Amino acid sequence: MNQMQSYADVHPPHMSAATAHAPASAAPSGISHYAYPPQSSMMQPGQHQYGPTPPGYPSYGYSNGVPSGLPASSSMNNAMVPSTLQLPAMSSSGPSPSLSGAQSYAPHSFDHTGQVAPPGMKPRVTATLWEDEGSLCFQVEAKGVCVARREDNHMINGTKLLNVAGMTRGRRDGILKSEKTRHVVKIGPMHLKGVWIPFERALEFANKEKITEQLYPLFVHDIGALLYHPSNQTRASVGSAAMAAVDRRRPDSMQTQRYISGPTTSQPPSLHHHHSMSNPIGAPMSQAPHALQPHPSAGRPGLDRAHTFPTPPTSASSIMGMSNSGSSYEWSGANVQTPQGSQPLSIDTGLSNTRSVPTTPATTPPGAVQQAISYGSNQSYDNSRPMYSGPPSQPGQYNTQGQSMMGYRPDSGYTKTEMAPPSRLADVSEEGDVKHSEGMMPQGNSQVVAPAPGPEGDHEHDNEYTHSTASYNGSRGPYGYASNGNAGGLHPEHPHMSPEMNGSPHQNGSGRATPRTTTTSQTQWNSGYPTPQRQGPPSSNLYNVMSDPRGAPNGNAPHDAYPGPGAVPQYASQGYPPANGNAKRGRDDDDEDPYRPDSVQSDDMGGLKRRKTMEGGAVGGAYAQDPTPGLQRAHTMTAQRARR
């Protein structure tokens, strides 16, 4: 008894007097399933074998009911219809009718009209709008099957109705196919699909299969009056079991409504969403943050990203060609953030930019902007890498700086002075000329401006070599390049020079080189890899060391250094306006030349190691533009030979 009580509070009476109270079990209609334990007690009089049967409602207690006198069928009724009385319907549905089905029927008068509620049965009906058919549908659930009835023509879904009877699919389909009046529905919610048959035929099938009471109130003529209304939910008349059942069905009805596009259920959610959206919008102060975050938040991030992404291009261009120090910081920050979490870059860039501001950002930007803009974003990321690797060797920083330094152009002027270049400028006056021939570092601050147009194309080639030389130059720290005398000539190719300068930035040792590198950084940006530039350094070292003012101290004449592989790009950079065209050709050669001092010896005077230059005399043309072509050639020849 106790166990039974535990199953259902409603059933305690059953528990106490399971047999006598069998009817009481009817009270919990919804709990009929759980009530089966009491049934088992009821069944005890009959046969414990039925204890298991309770799960199968049909067999519940027909035998039990017979022996106990209290038809366990009531338990069946509970399952289907919580009626304390023996329910013939239950027995009919139950497979055990063979045992005591007749007996159970006898006590209970079977309602063939479907208008009378079985004892203890409470109507549970839901309605949804069947948009496709333009009609309301009343739904009654029996044995877990939702049987629908149309409001307009009162046709009933025969497929679902026969499913309640537990009929096999083949038999069910055969019966429905033989129906003269039928409406086949193949599209729509699952509970509305099937073969719809007239009300009368459905009632006949229900009576024949003895499921009429289970389907109550499906066949009630005024079924609309029995509709469940949320306001009725609290009525005391509705038993807790009924409430539970109703609650359980609510989801079903809601689903049905969704499928049928029920107006009430679906609308509220949409309304809520709209409200939440509108409220945030309307009252962004308090709700906007919260309400918007769910929906708009995605949008907002999108906006932020949009700003970020657009900004980098603008910043990049500004950095390259523009000297917006603020924008350069922002740009590096924004770009870096997008690609790499550029904050480190932005920070490093800011620092390095300050140092490398001297780079020829102001002048470089024009040409650099063109290349840098296209490459800028990618290179910025690459540069960011150099920054990290660079800090050890500063070249990276300078490269980064070069990029950001573009933005800092205004700073670059004084920064350059801060950098070794300013002092170099005096020293490099001669070297500057030579370097002009190289077209490398000499571009310095002022050079940057001119180089933009022609060198850009060259920068790409020069970057690799330039970077290589740059690293050497960086070691040289003091760059004869600083001499800005060449700035004018170099300036046009400053971007190319920048690559060379970039090489020096790799060296980072020399502040000047870094600024130039910064200028070249644009080129580097194009190359996007400081490393490629560093590759050049070995060859450029040989030459640059000689040609650099530092190189001279090393015993390498700055002239030779300039002729060095780095020099070739430099010449292209300096390229002096005519040299630019040559520089481009030279670049092709440069790829080869950096490794070939021989070419330099022949005609690479001015630091250009280019077969073409030697053969075509392009170098000569470019050098003609050079302020000190003769010196450069002499230096180049001497330095290269000395190196060898």
From Swiss-Prot:
Residues 38-47, 253-269, 334-357, 371-383, 395-404, 525-544, 635-644 have a biased composition (Polar residues). Residues 456-465 have a biased composition (Basic and acidic residues). Coiled coil: none annotated. Disruption phenotype: Produces thick white aerial hyphae but impairs sporulation. Affects the expression of genes involved in central carbon metabolism including glycolysis, the TCA cycle, and amino acid synthesis. Decreases pathogenicity after inoculation of detached wheat leaves. It is found in: Nucleus. Keywords: Conidiation, DNA-binding, Nucleus, Sporulation, Transcription, Transcription regulation, Virulence. Pfam families: KilA-N. GO terms for molecular function: DNA binding. Residues 18-33, 87-104, 315-328, 509-524 have a biased composition (Low complexity). One of its GO terms (cellular component) is nucleus. One of its GO terms (biological process) is conidium formation. Residues 124-230 form the HTH APSES-type domain. Residues 158-179 bind DNA. Residues 18-58, 86-120, 239-644 are annotated as: Disordered. Residues 584-612 are annotated as: Nuclear localization domain. Belongs to the EFG1/PHD1/stuA family. Transcription factor that regulates asexual reproduction. Binds the StuA-response elements (StRE) with the consensus sequence 5'-(A/T)CGCG(T/A)N(A/C)-3' at the promoters of target genes. Required for pathogenicity and positively regulates the synthesis of the mycotoxin alternariol. Acts as a positive regulator of Tox3 but is not required for the expression of ToxA. Also acts as a central regulator of carbon metabolism including glycolysis, the TCA cycle, and amino acid synthesis. This is Cell pattern formation-associated protein StuA. It comes from Phaeosphaeria nodorum (strain SN15 / ATCC MYA-4574 / FGSC 10173). The gene is StuA.
